[in-house]
Amino acid sequence: MKMQTLNFTSSLLFLSFIFLSCALLISSQQSPSQPHSEPPSQLPFEPPVESPFFPPSQPPIFVPPSQPPSLPPSQSQSPSLACKSTPYPKLCRTILNAVKSSPSDPYRYGKFTIKQCLKQASRLSKVITSYARRVESKPGSATAEEIGAVADCGELSELSVNYLETVTTELKTAQVMTAALVEHVNSLLSGVVTNQQTCLDGLVEAKSGFAAAIGSPMGNLTRLYSISLGLVSHALNRNLKRFKASKGKILGGGNSTYREPLETLIKGLRKTCDNDKDCRKTSRNLGELGETSGGSILVSKAVIVGPFKSDNFTTITDAIAAAPNNTRPEDGYFVIYAREGVYEEYIVVPINKKNLMLMGDGINKTIITGNHNVVDGWTTYNCSSFAVVGERFMAVDVTFRNTAGPEKHQAVALRNNAEGSSFYRCSFEGYQDTLYVHSLRQFYRECDIYGTVDFIFGNAAAIFQNCNIYARKPMAKQKNAITAHGRLDPNQNTGISIINCTIKAAPDLAAEPKSAMTFLGRPWKPYSRTVFMQSYISDIVQPVGWLEWNGTIGLDTIYYGEYSNFGPGANTNQRVQWLGYNLLNLAEAMNFTVYNFTMGDTWLPQTDIPFYGGLLSKE
């Protein structure tokens, strides 16, 4: 159906102002350079020389961070030299040369472009918000799909402004440049690039007239984001080599918080709040239910969601709304214990709700479910049963489900664009696009993931450890792809790393194994990056292993890898012969561990979720 479009005059005038006022963006539209497919450059710190492995059940030992010296200015660089680290060197030189007092320090180049990014992102966000309001105020002027896509763009543009403000503040106030800070900055800048592309993809899919009006300015702004990412990432990592990186530490808490092992917290809450018993105990009482031994989690408060009079809330949404805003890691987790039951509510953890822990009674006991999908007019970005944006979110013993079915195509169970988020003993159930690992750094441990087409997809830096990945039976003539990573830029620190997992057929596909072909993944975007390491791969996976997305597009620039997998589907003799496909050696594989890929050893200890920083010992 052909869409009706609004009069774009006012929006175009404002967009033209952006386009003209941003002289640094007016340049020839240069395509990204096409580098050879190579292993990722060395990350902030290498695994210990004496042993490349950590024991499977033990995280690294954490010590108080050393205090590196403040960073002296880097050696001067010309714009031409600095811009070699970006995908758009010609446009980059135009940007830096446009400033009369052009800074010569690479770090200042990056900070200058971030300032420009924030200025233009704020303007673009206002344009999108204004247009969204006009669409909503004129019923019938746009389709439901277009309204949804524009709303997504508004949300994503606001997130990008927030990320850029955070980066600006952190770079301005940092006394020392730790490895953890560098990785956090890189993650947020990578997220900005991803947000922009998600907006554009959604507008195009909705056949929105607004896409044509906003496409050129957004394209230029995307290039600016990409240039800033390249400059900042390169400059910070150069400076980082001046001292040894510090490891993470366990943060202390204030008088209103307490520490206890995660398992003790879980058992204590379930025991104390059994059935309809009074759960209105103080945080201190809950904290004294068990003895602390080894790791622990810092808790500020615990609330209960359930049907009993003694429970604090009847919906998870209300419990989230009651959580404090913008808390810090040292403030502790706000714990939401959702009793066994089916929660038919569409839940969003917004960006201001940080340090939330959602705890259930176990897989298939505490269930969050919905059925929104693309066929019924929802966008892929906004059709999830559960969405999380707030930093440091963690979930334990919960099932996230989308019941739309394969005939409804994209139907997301959980969308995650939360920095430093983690999921432990959770289940994600759907068909196409089950788990949307949208952006930023994520960790999944001992989880079950069910789906058909692209059922782990997005552009996060996501690590899966000890998970079960089940391919379901798709619709006729469909092919299963376990992963579809969306890395857009060679400087993004994103990818999917699957370690010590089990890949096999779900019961419906196991009953008819020849009804559909299953592949490890396909490249959603040109720099897609995915590795399978030390995992069991059943014979459900085709001998070629991987599937192209659109002909040969991206096959030379992606980075797909396998390392030390086993099982009947792990034989690599007949694997694809793409330039971007790699059989990894140990050194290359170590780049995709918790220790190196997401620097999880600097933030996962706060969750007390078990993890290993390296690879499994071969002993």
From Swiss-Prot:
Residues 37-72 have a biased composition (Pro residues). Glycans are attached at residues 220, 255, 312, 325, 364, 382, 500, 550, 591, 596. GO terms for biological process: cell wall modification; pectin catabolic process. It catalyses: [(1->4)-alpha-D-galacturonosyl methyl ester](n) + n H2O = [(1->4)-alpha-D-galacturonosyl](n) + n methanol + n H(+). The record marks 432 as: Transition state stabilizer. Its EC number is 3.1.1.11. CDD domains: PMEI-like_3. Substrate binds at residues 380, 410, 522, 524. Disulfide bonds join 447-467. This is Probable pectinesterase/pectinesterase inhibitor 25.
